[in-house]
Design a protein with these regions (language model features):
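N-terminal anchoring/stem segment of glycosyltransferases
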Residues: 1-84, 91, 105-113
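GT-A fold catalytic core of metal-dependent nucleotide-sugar glycosyltransferases
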Residues: 92-148
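Short, solvent-exposed helix-helix connector turns and helix-capping sites enriched
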Residues: 85-87, 128
Length: 149
């Protein structure tokens, strides 16, 4: 059976505003065989009860910490020397990149047949039932495609 793996990331603010809705909707509507991993930063999981999702800290990833340190001045203001520009902010979406690549590396190390890896933004909602066959039926576009749920 093909394994389906979803990955997302969030911090405390994103979780309290939108992320908890995603987690609840996954628990309610998704087949349990769909694996969901959430990487977190600036978030204390001990303050929450989160079931059905594998939580992993981004700050345990050495490359992530090194990236943040090496690029701390590239925060969209070039260390407060210019007005904020989102396209100069090297940190803004880095958590997404590291969450997705870390999960991909983890799956590749576990098995040559790791299955699918699908990113889901934390501000998404799972409003309908989702099972493995629903996803596999979308494969008509080939091995790589964008999935909007």
């Amino acid at each position: 059976m093909t394994k389906i793996n979803f990955v997302t990331s969030f911090n405390e603010e994103l979780y309290t505003v939108v992320g908890h809705h995603l987690i609840k909707s996954i628990k309610k509507n998704w087949e349990p065989s769909l694996n969901v991993t959430a990487y977190y930063h600036k978030f204390n999981p001990k303050n929450y009860v989160i079931n059905r999702v594998d939580l992993k800290p981004l700050d345990k990833i050495e490359e992530y910490n090194t990236y943040l340190e090496n690029n701390k001045d590239h925060d969209g203001t070039e260390n407060s020397t210019i007005d904020y520009k989102w396209n100069l902010d090297a940190l803004r979406w880095s958590h997404k990149v590291f969450a997705l690549t870390e999960k991909a590396f983890e799956l590749a190390e576990e098995s040559a047949d790791a299955g699918w890896l699908i990113w889901i933004d934390v501000d998404s909602l799972a409003k309908k039932r989702l099972v493995t066959n629903d996803i596999l039926s979308m494969q008509a576009f080939g091995e790589v495609f964008g999935l909007f749920i």
